[in-house]
A protein has these predicted regions:
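Donor nucleotide-sugar binding/catalytic pocket of nucleotide-sugar-dependent glycosyltransferases
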Residues: 55, 119-157
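A conserved, positively charged/aromatic
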Residues: 69, 97-125, 137
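Short His-centered aromatic/hydrophobic patch
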Residues: 77-83, 104
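Aromatic "clamp/platform" in nucleotide-sugar-dependent glycosyltransferases that forms part
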Residues: 233, 252
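Conserved acidic donor-binding segment of nucleotide-sugar-dependent glycosyltransferases
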Residues: 284-285, 289-296, 305-311, 325
Length: 350
């Protein structure tokens, strides 16, 4: 089977990591792959290391040649700009395409977006919430739920030891997310204010950068907090997962929350908000704790509960390990294979 994966993002974040993971697994299973990517993205350097055809396209209107997809069975779209590339390529050369949608925002009611989604042979959402949002806009389309799979990271014990020394004798809570409004960092800071008076040994480390950083830093100064540290974007997440005691993810909206899966895979207990696709991952009191979005008191209470209750921590770690089996890359790759094959079967019957 020959699949053309398209991801035109200029950066490299969760969606690109998940695309790369699927590509890597499919190569192991014997797929032939073509990848269309943005030359500005770090994603390209990773693809060049793999045994697949790479096409560089700086815009969805670029690189439309029959030779790119003439041997491909399906075009697989992985982000918002890529869908328009797939629409053009499909219209010109007749190759069907599917779309994986990773965010839980309502689909835009714009003519080009509607055309692009309407012409897709199948649509995929990572979570129940995303599937629901797709159905609202395109109720007649074939829609599948296929979650992303957790990425595993290497661990350098020397780096872990350095983190431990920096936060010695503290219960280390990490939030690993870009500093964007919907990621809920303001709720984290508000919770830190409550925790500072409650337990001086709990420390919150914010791993990520973004437009909200200055605002959040000012809030920390205003509250005179000594239990919050801004550490910027971190490239060695495996070391942080190994060093931390708890991961929190109090987003106001979230497609799925792949960082939660990554933390579970690293045997870290997790707390997340009851928003978007996060409840698809966290079964409250079993594989993690759920709190309502924007509720700083509930978040502070949950953090304190995990910090002070070792049996609960162990229970959540065990539950997390059991939960991630449902998100294993071999399993999710098999689900995509079923989608591809159904498209080929229907095409043969026409």
């Amino acid at each position: 089977m020959h699949i053309c994966h398209v991801n035109l993002a200029s950066g490299f974040s969760g969606g690109e990591r998940q695309t790369l993971q699927l590509i890597t697994r499919q190569l192991k299973e014997g797929y032939q792959l073509t990848v269309v990517a943005n030359p500005k993205s770090p994603f390209v350097a990773d693809i060049k290391k793999l045994n697949c055809k790479l096409v560089l396209a700086s815009h969805f209107s670029k690189q439309h040649k029959k030779s790119i997809t003439e041997h491909c069975d399906v075009i697989h779209v992985h982000e918002g700009r890529a869908i328009y590339w797939a629409l053009i390529q499909s219209k010109r050369f007749g190759v069907p395409y599917i779309v994986t949608r990773r965010i839980d925002n309502p689909l835009k009611d714009k003519w080009l977006s509607n055309i692009a989604y309407s012409n897709a042979t199948a649509l995929v959402g990572l979570s129940n919430e995303i599937v629901s949002k797709i159905k609202e806009r395109h109720p007649d389309k074939v829609i599948y739920k296929i979650p992303s799979s957790p990425v595993s990271y290497s661990v350098e014990q020397e780096n872990v030891d350095t983190i431990w020394r920096r936060f010695s004798n503290q219960f280390l809570v990490i939030q690993a997310a870009n500093l964007l409004h919907h990621k809920g960092h303001q709720t984290t800071v508000e919770a830190a204010k409550l925790l500072q008076d409650l337990d001086s040994n709990i420390h919150l480390a914010l791993l990520g950068d973004g437009p909200e950083r200055e605002k959040l830093e000012n809030l920390v100064k205003e509250y005179d907090l000594h239990n919050v540290t801004f550490l910027g974007k971190q490239n060695r997440m495996g070391d942080w997962f190994a060093a931390a005691d708890l991961l929190i993810h109090p987003s106001y909206s979230e497609g799925l929350g792949s960082v939660i899966l990554e933390a579970m895979g690293a045997k870290l207990p997790v707390i997340g908000s009851n928003a978007g696709g996060i409840p698809d991952i966290i079964d409250d009191q079993e594989s993690g704790l759920l709190v309502e979005a924007r509720d700083a008191q509930a978040l502070a209470d949950a953090i304190y509960q995990v910090a002070t209750d070792k049996p609960l921590r162990n229970k959540l770690i065990t539950g997390g390990q059991e939960k991630i089996a449902m998100f294993d890359i071999k399993y999710t790759t098999s689900l995509y294979k079923d989608v591809y094959q159904s498209i080929l079967l229907n095409g043969d019957e026409k």
